[in-house]
């Protein structure tokens, strides 16, 4: 989901 994209760690 989008949260995963924002936290590219």
UniProtKB/Swiss-Prot annotation:
GO cellular component, as recorded: extracellular region
Post-translational modification: Conversion of fibrinogen to fibrin is triggered by thrombin, which cleaves fibrinopeptides A and B from alpha and beta chains, and thus exposes the N-terminal polymerization sites responsible for the formation of the soft clot.
Localisation per UniProt entry: Secreted
Keywords: Adaptive immunity, Blood coagulation, Coiled coil, Disulfide bond, Hemostasis, Immunity, Innate immunity, Secreted
Single Gene Ontology BP annotation: blood coagulation
Main localization, broad class: secreted
Domain text: A long coiled coil structure formed by 3 polypeptide chains connects the central nodule to the C-terminal domains (distal nodules). The long C-terminal ends of the alpha chains fold back, contributing a fourth strand to the coiled coil structure.
Protein role: Cleaved by the protease thrombin to yield monomers which, together with fibrinogen alpha (FGA) and fibrinogen gamma (FGG), polymerize to form an insoluble fibrin matrix. Fibrin has a major function in hemostasis as one of the primary components of blood clots. In addition, functions during the early stages of wound repair to stabilize the lesion and guide cell migration during re-epithelialization. Was originally thought to be essential for platelet aggregation, based on in vitro studies using anticoagulated blood.
Subunit structure: Heterohexamer; disulfide linked. Contains 2 sets of 3 non-identical chains (alpha, beta and gamma). The 2 heterotrimers are in head to head conformation with the N-termini in a small central domain.
Protein name: Fibrinogen beta chain
Annotated source species: Macaca fuscata fuscata (Japanese macaque)
Gene that this polypeptide is encoded by: FGB
